[in-house]
Amino acid sequence: MSSAKPLRLPPNFTEDRFSEFISRAGNLCGHENIRIVSSAEELVDGDYMNPCKAHDMHAIYDRDFFVASAVICPRDVPNVQGIVRLANEFCMPIWPYSAGRNTGYGGSAPRVSGSIALDLGTHMNKVLDVNIDGAFALVEPGVTFMQLHDYLEENNLRDHLWLDVPDLGGGSIIGNAVERGVGYTPYGDHWMMHCGLEIILPNGELIRTGMGALPEPGADKSLRPDEQKGNRCWQLFNYGFGPYNDGIFTQSSLGIIVKMGIWLMPNPGGYQAYMITFPRDDDLSAIQMVLQNVPTLRHILLDAAVAGNKASYTDKNGPLNDQEIDAIAKKLDLGRWNFYGAVYGPEPVRNVLLDVIKKSFLAIPGAKFWLPEDRSEPYSVLHTRAKTLQGIPSLDELRWVSWMPNGAHLFFSPITKISGKDANLQYEITKRRCAEAGLDFIGTFTIGMRDMHHIVCIVFNREDPVQRQNARWLIRTLIRDCAEHGWGEYRTHIALMDQIAATYSFNDNAQMKLNETIKNALDPNGILAPGKNGIWPQSYSKSEWELGEEETLIKKPSL
């Protein structure tokens, strides 16, 4: 079979060798399940529900800077195993993803351009099991939060079980969990709520972790291993026996997860969402943030961007000043900071919890308490959060990306302790740097069990090369700023993985040395997602593949 010439060949490949790989991959998966990316004109960004599959729809460099040579859509587990074994034979880098969204962190783009994008979600997208008594589901990579929620609704299971969802419901449950993404109910730590994995290792071997390693008595051994019924406790007890391996398969390049168990939240018997608005930036240090679920504290411009784009509020191009931000808050009847949370349980329990919350928060001068029925404006964030906080997915949060024309975004996600003082310091640093870059600060604090995720939404015009460069300058500068304060990021864009990995440098980079040792032991040919989270296999020269950290800030006269 002859194949088209790819826009970017994999490292150390000739066109003939690439064509041979594609031909043999087509024999494994079906030639109809392979698409070669042969020209820049094919790099159409699409949209969230129809994402591009070979590059980043929110590119911070040119679209073809991080781009796959081809996209392969395996039909089942044996297809994935076959592609992995073939990749070892050819030393072909492959970049697996579930749904390919991962917006703000690189989308479906590979870290090594020319890699084969392995699109698991197109065909491998089944809800394999939902168990009421055990309160869990077993899913394939392509199952999205929307899909599992719809499954619960269609099978009349919502009275028994709730799903925890992130801001946008179109993402893969497996993809979000293994990147350690979060939602907003008491089950908001998605990786914490996983239980049991089925994984294809870099040599093509299939394993099940935890209790899944114990065969189920009576399982039909005539079936393929991936088709055999799992142990009845596979989704009930995470650890099994011996070393607990699951964690090394998160944010890593050590295996391809093809099945995952996820715990679902038993219906709590009642629920109430609420919002509390705070009028001043200074209130940030006074807000107490240890509560029942995973609440969020959102800056006014994040909520304003949901309600309308920047041009609907001002004709100013540069970052808004305090007076302009306060005018927007007044127009929307919101605070400078807006806190969204929920309480769960029967009504008497909810009432007690709400009384405690009101007593604590309303002691801050000017703070106001709102229930969803108190708000009637279009695109009410409280109405959206009232769905999200009870596990009903939505797409409403897509609206804030349109704050700028040709809107794109890049997430900066440092971790800190739950402290008003720390939150205020992080906010002051990030707000100042955003202003220097000519961009508005748009962000939120997401409160976990012991920590806060500070999600800074760097929104820029993707068609403006200056804004793209300034966004890169901004986030690289923030990485350095935060490391100097002992704050590290928990997740990042593919372009920044090397820089952030280098900040985790305790004891002469001992953790990275361990990661590289494990990588080279399990993946000696370095075929699986080379460079993922800064971990480069021995077959790549790390110094040649790392991206430089220096970016030049470009000042526009209009800014």
What are these regions (language model features)?
Residues I34-S39, C73, I94-S98, L118-L120, ...:
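General beta-strand structural signal in soluble alpha/beta enzymes
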Residues L43, N79-V80, N102-G106, F145-Q147, ...:
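Flexible loop/turn segments at secondary-structure boundaries
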